[in-house]
């Protein structure tokens, strides 16, 4: 595997968002057409190179190794719908993008908004989908006291359907304190994928749920290993994406099904892999939801869509430069991409 070969195989795309997500209106990604399949490199633009190198590692694993030999069973993966931090009046339109889905993740603690906004959004979701299970994601946006206050208010707004609060605070220590003080289960996301030690959440009994995202954890092999280890500490598992294109979603679906098939006795929650429905266009046609499920299968982008969604030249240069820097980090680290599954 050589850098020049990777760049020759790369396509940079810009996908317009139907609904803004964390302030993003266009999602950019670098896709790699490798000998074993397609990989994705799309760390958010504010991420530094050290953190972003794990995303490159995951993309190279998909493109150059592939995932043959993983038991996918019937391939059906239950997903959750995702509701960005929209006004309550916009909730119904977002929900319509997820027919048949029985679980929704709702963004809260958005900068510039208040707890009242969050309560209204969650109440609107519950009104339109009263039988749906709900989870909220604060992305570390609260203090401990704010999280404790919010937990009660949001549980009430959810009408008894709130299943967990994801990453209420930034630090693992704060998560542990919040978990001790509230009745709603706590999920860890950033405290796993952005941490030097992803197992600290288990050591401090800081979470009931582990959110596992393939790209920031460095690939399928690493993700399955971390998920298995955290499940051994009585944590349930939610496999999720980081606003991936269909390429990354395809890999996430494979991991979600692999977790379900290989970890007997582990509670596997509906996967956070439905965000493709927040795009206006993607590199393939949106996969049809069947019974609230998507099929686990690798994605092969459509050539016409790749061309139509190609990013402008200066953005291609930005992503190529970023890939080069992250490649240097991986190369210095040893450049090993052979990771066993499980």
Briefly describe each language-model feature range:
Residues 104-114, 133-140, 160-171, 184-194, ...:
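Catalytic beta/alpha-barrel core
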Residues 32-34, 104, 137, 165, ...:
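Conserved, mostly hydrophobic/aromatic
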Residues 110-128, 142-146, 168-180, 195-197, ...:
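Active-site-adjacent beta->alpha loops and helix N-cap segments on the catalytic face
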Residues 98-102, 128-131, 152-162, 179-187, ...:
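Glycine-enriched alpha-helix->loop->beta-strand junction motifs that scaffold or abut catalytic
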Residues 1-135, 139-158, 283-342:
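N-terminal capping/lid subdomain adjacent to the active-site entrance of alpha/beta enzymes
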Residues 199, 203-306:
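Shared catalytic-loop signature of beta/alpha-barrel
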